[in-house]
Amino acid sequence: MIKSLSRKPGFALAALAVAVATAAPTVSAQEELEEVIVTGSRIPVDSNAVSSVPIQAISEEDIRNAGEINIADIVADIPALVSSLTAENSSTGANALNLRGLGGSRTLTLVNGRRHVAGFRGSQAVDVGSIPRALVKSVEVTTGGASAVYGADAVTGVVNFILRDDFEGLQVDLSTGRPERGAGETTVLDIAWGTNFAGGRGNAVLTVSAEDDGGILYGERSWSRNNGIATTLNNPDPNGPPRAVVNDPRYWLTSHEGSIAPGFGGRGNTYVDINGNGIADCQESEGGRVGYLAGCWLTNPDGSVRVNQDGVLIDGLFGTGGDGAYADHNSDTLYPETDRQVVNFNVSYEFSDTLRGFLETKYVKAETNTFSEYDGFFDTLEITPDNPYLPAELQPVMDQVGYLIFTKDALDWHEDGSEYTRETTRVVAGLEWQPSEDHMVEFSVNQGIFEQKSESTSILLDRFYAAMDTVADANGNPVCRSDLDPTAAYPIDYFAWANGYTEGSFYSDRYYTFTPGDGQCQPLNPFGTYA
């Protein structure tokens, strides 16, 4: 049995010297002192009492009484960690601790005092959701900077998860939860089995966990339904405070149905008055006066058009009410749906009173699904004079200008979903050697592998632009121009041109996913919803 005043694991191939406080009481040679793990301190005391750095500790009893399914939610209740990334506000369902709000990469997360492989692409932050809750004995949070001890990634502090190494028996925990408002059901199954061997000199423990988070959509909560989440924006009232709480926030420069404006250079002119109120349509709204990035008219579900209505404009992008595009939609993901499986196997063995070996292995697989009702953002699409879908009300405008500009934040062109699969593998093996009562040396090898795969739906731009470029064939039926003339260039929007989709003009003759003229292109009617 290894006996010492303090043990602080966490450095591979490094010797850790423990200094005994001068104020400590004298200890007789016959007394055996209990082993104590203290994170971020070289003084062997209760981490909640006295330490050379600020430390907060969460005990096994605290974890059990918290009633939380995810260990990250328990730790995030500490005031210094309230800025942490949890599954509720993560698009991938991952969890990252964030001390003092300075970022997860500046908070060092350890398991048994040893480093853990990152759980995010391009970041050093650890996915805390991969730590087996059933084995957590305590959590120690060093809220002071610990760069001198642990390096630059511990600028804001250290969070150390200490796992049980003496588990014996079988423990099965099944937890389920369902919010009172419905949706978001959660089920977690934890199975832990452990045994001592070799007369108590060794211990082996295996844990298997399965977690199913049902997820919540915006439309499944009254406070978020129908674009109901209020936000703070610039106050349009010059006599009020600079910021105001605004309900029903919208992007007034665009719409879901499709905003229509005269071609470039034609904005603000008096073309038609389709609602017959004596005011030219393009003068009835700020969107009409702006023109090409907004519009004078909007399409109706049946393909007809109406005059654009502004609502209350807040700034150059946001407003409330009117015909602008919603900020949020009922089918958008509010809380992601996540399935997670964790398998953890640890072994420790005391070769002698001064030498102990350990092995920690873990495999985690998590799958997260999110959904957004937005299909894409398409601005300044060109509608040509020979487009057979052109509404009759706008034919006079087309005759004067020569083409129309179409902008749409589409909801009806395809379903936009994303699936994230994350796999984490971690293996740590090492030896702890205690040559004397106040010295400890640890030799360890730590290997971790993190892989993330993401799949999402998107629109194939060459097919989309070709489908938008619709003309009538000899029989008057709508067809793609590329089927009649495979050499024809199709119009693209301004932003595709600016991003190098083509060069020199707002047209492209590049086809990446189909051969023009092969009959694959299906004409798209931009006027009307689900047309």
Indicate residue ranges for each PLM-predicted region.
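Short N-terminal segments immediately surrounding and downstream of signal-peptide cleavage
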Residues: 31-43, 287-291, 298-299
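Short aromatic-centered micro-motifs
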Residues: 109
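Surface-exposed beta-strand-turn/loop segments characteristic
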Residues: 73, 77-79, 85, 93-94, ...
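Short, polar/charged loop or turn motifs at beta-strand boundaries
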Residues: 51-70, 97-102, 128-129, 176-180, ...
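Structured loop/turn residues at beta-strand edges in well-structured enzyme cores
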Residues: 31, 102, 126, 134-137
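Cleavable N-terminal targeting peptides that direct proteins into the secretory/outer-membrane pathway or into
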Residues: 1-32
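N-terminal periplasmic "start-of-domain" segments of outer-membrane beta-barrel proteins
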Residues: 35-66, 119, 170
